[in-house]
Amino acid sequence: MALAIKKRVGTYVETVDGSPPVKKLRLQTLAADAKGGKSGKVGNVERKLTALNQLDAYVGNLPAGALVLPTGTPVASTGAPSTGVIGNPPAAATGAPPMTAANSRELLELLVKITDEISYEDVEMGELKEVASKIFQLYQLQERDSDTSIRVKLLELLSGLGCECATEQALTMIIDYFIFLLRKEVSQKVLAQGMMCLFRIGERRKHMLPISYKTQVAHLAKEQLRSGSAHTQKNAMLVIGRFATKMEGERHYVWKLAFYIDSQDSSVRAQALHALLTLGERGSQLPAVLYKRAVEAMKDDYECVRKEALQLVFMLGNRHPDYILPSDRQQEELRMIDAAFSKVCEALCDLSLQIRVLAAELLGGMTAVSREFLHQTLDKKLMSNLRRKRTAHERGARLVASGEWSSGKRWADDAPQEHLDAQSISIIASGACGALIHGLEDEFLEVRTAAVASMCKLALSRPDFAVTSLDFLVDMFNDEIEDVRLKAIYSLTAIAKHIVLREDQLEIMLGSLEDYSVDVREGLHLMLGACRVSTQTCLLMVVQKLLDVLAKYPQDRNSTYACMRKIGQKHPHLVMAVAVHLLYVHPFFETPERDVEDPAYLCVLILVFNAAEHLVPIISLLPTATHRHYAYLRDSMPNLVPQLPIEGASSASATHRIDSAMHQAGSSAEYLQMILSHIEEIFTMTDERLELLQTAQSNLQRLGSIDAGMYGTSNFLETFLAAQIQIEQMQRCASTQRSRVPLKESLAALIRNCLKLQHTFSGLNYGDILQVKQLRLRACALHLVLVVRDRSQSALGPCQMLLQTAGDISEFIKANTKDEEEKPPVVETDMPMKESVSRDAQPDSFTRQLLIKLDGISDPKPGRVFREILPLVQQAPPLALPPANDKIRRCVANILEPCPLQSQDNVIKVTAGLIAAVPFVAEIDNLLESQKADMRIKIKYPDQHMHTVVPKQSDFKPIMTEQGEHKTNVRLRTTILLSHSVWTESSLVEIQLCLAVRPGSELELCKPAKVLFAPKPVRRGI
């Protein structure tokens, strides 16, 4: 028996064997959907909006012509009002019962219940007009001195309809209702709620509104700014920021909003600044003269105002960087970006944590600041409010120019001193002076983290600032918080191309290598590989410290190997000078050959070999034993050891054959096209076709192992070809009556290959997905035919799987056809060749005929379906391979811990029945965000007992590179628990990463890691 379960993630429907029986399924094809789509949809809407029918008792019984449209057409004949001239909506009802206090209370309770339960999804135009008209009538019936809560709830219902409008006509009708009702409203509570409802509609559906309606809504909100309610003013500013057009915002609304920056209410001041920011973000040009108002607002007593003012200062500084600001107390003038940078730096001394964090984050975005102001952020010397100190010559010249005389020995020594304003004097450093240092020394980690990030952004744009800030970033390695240390490490990695490390800086960095956190150690390995050192002594310090830490933390070998590889590539001349010392080569005596499996010796070899790639004379310094070790490491670690001209390095015959063919082809892509052309020729043959296809399959597999960039594409085609070969082999069994039915394992392998194509590959275009779905449809049809022929198992499950797969591909084709009709025509010359080919892909004749036959079956029982599709399955031509798509990536995993080399030697011993914790580390490439929830860790014991572990989402962390976080490559670091009853001896336990694509079926992403596990009997006490 079988149960059809529809998977939430994905578009296909799977079948799980062994479940209770369910009702028979019928294929819903394009014709069936088109025939019954309307009725089902209307029923769905009626079910969702039935609750609004309860309002009829409060609206009253209207005569047929009572509700008149602007054009004079009764609603009874149209079913809904039409949108027309604003200000002439449908007239209010006249036959409603009088509204008493009890009725008002009942109506309010009913509206609250409806608001909580109603769903607006898939509302048709006619239904929406009818419901909106009903709400409008009920609103008109409410007296102005009655309870405002009813009108507020009615506006909420109306805004809910507006947020789900699918057409411009329906949306403009809702906006007409809002404008008409709010112009006549006098209650500030209702006006404030109406403004908020318009803002919500603008967030969801503003792109559908015509410009004229946007202007009218913004003008309505502008009128409400004169309201005496602060709540109404705030919501009106929200509406202006959302609806005002770019040109209208610059001409009419900017200065109107700027007027309210001086409002008595702090929330109004903050909202006015926020509305200006919203207009600026939407493209309106904010005038530079607003800068002075924003600076004054930064001194506000309320945090919300200072926060918005700080962002406005930042925006104005970046929008008008070269605008010259006059200075009252100085003769020289400042650029606005420099003045804004100084004000943002001052905010780093604010009492509020949120403002200090925001100021530290904004500093990184002001890259146009002058060099002098930027470097002042790292100098804590006290300055006189950023006033430039004048030389004695300049001061004397100024006295002479003044023409004043004094009785003393100096010019103007009796002149009155400069008048000092008490507010301009600051005991601490002001302006940009020492601002980043204050941020790095803040007591809260959020400020320190933001300051480190901003320092990194500024250093990336200014190489001279990167050199100056290096010492301060290195000091952050000693921070007490791990996240701050990691941020400093990754920031230094990003600016590594601009700096060269000194010996004193290396001492602090290398001291952090002994950190207990594995993330910090791996981050330091990445950073050391990206940086450059200045001397041989520094290089020896780094290498020796890495080897010492590797002996202490052997689990860091992979990141240490990668670090040694990068160091060798960046310092070939320094490595050449110390290579003899690192390899213990004596000038007179022959040293003993070292163990090639020693991790420390491996690190040195990786360092030397990668340096020799850029400086070939290093090879002459290597002893003979090292040449043999190179041949071994080149085969075992090809990603860490480069190709070198060393004699004795052998290669396998298959590799040599593929390499020579690729060399003749010119590139991997050309060689792949050559393989695909050969496969097309093979499909035209009749004799020995399977053997040739298997040879092409091995060539595709080998191509992916040689060229990492083509791995996803070649593996996708190889898996597709493997499924084709399996289908062709099973098709021969279905062609004759006497043929032996394949085993269940063969059918399961075919279905597994189809699932791999569907779930482990990303970057597929429409043509690739269509070919995969057609392949799965063929596999399901063949599965049903073979199961019915076998007669030893139920065919209900395969039959349902075939119907569901056919329905899935039918919906997929229908959806793509609908999208193509809605898209505007595209000029073929502007479209890439691959995209045009994939978009024009059509299902083959087998798929079309099979869908037609399944659609014609009224009662799809397995026997009848079998008889209908048997001729098609027996005569099905081979399915063409999809064209090569270089954007395809495959999700693969590599288990780092437990290590296969050490797990055979270290036996995990535990008392039987108790739990042993085993660290588990794996790197997963090309993992989509939606696939993280489907990741599983499968543990298989020697007695074939298995259990599956679901890792936590927090255990997935992106892999860091020199360019930052990798988008699709993640590292899974967790702990798995092993437990079992007593065994006689230690046995292997297999640990594997899988992707759960359907209940009871997982796709393996890597080879299993094996650990020796020995549960011992419990010791009995005396």
From Swiss-Prot:
InterPro entries: ARM-like, ARM-type_fold, INTS4_8HBD
Subcellular location: Nucleus
Keyword Nucleotidyltransferase annotated: no
GO cellular component, one term: nucleus
GO molecular function, one term: inositol hexakisphosphate binding
GO biological process terms on file: RNA polymerase II transcription initiation surveillance; snRNA 3'-end processing; snRNA processing
One Pfam assignment: INTS4_C
Keywords, in A-Z order: Nucleus
Chain positions recorded as 1D-myo-inositol hexakisphosphate binding sites: T148, K184
Residue ranges of the region described as Disordered: 818-840
Membrane-spanning parts: none
Domain of life: Eukaryota
Family: Belongs to the Integrator subunit 4 family.
Subunit structure of this chain's protein: Belongs to the multiprotein complex Integrator, at least composed of IntS1, IntS2, IntS3, IntS4, omd/IntS5, IntS6, defl/IntS7, IntS8, IntS9, IntS10, IntS11, IntS12, asun/IntS13, IntS14 and IntS15. The core complex associates with protein phosphatase 2A subunits mts/PP2A and Pp2A-29B, to form the Integrator-PP2A (INTAC) complex. IntS4 is part of the RNA endonuclease subcomplex, composed of IntS4, IntS9, IntS11 and inositol hexakisphosphate (InsP6).
Function: Component of the integrator complex, a multiprotein complex that terminates RNA polymerase II (Pol II) transcription in the promoter-proximal region of genes. The integrator complex provides a quality checkpoint during transcription elongation by driving premature transcription termination of transcripts that are unfavorably configured for transcriptional elongation: the complex terminates transcription by (1) catalyzing dephosphorylation of the C-terminal domain (CTD) of Pol II subunit Polr2A/Rbp1 and Spt5, and (2) degrading the exiting nascent RNA transcript via endonuclease activity.
Protein name as it appears in the record: Integrator complex subunit 4
Organism of origin: Drosophila melanogaster
GN (gene name): IntS4
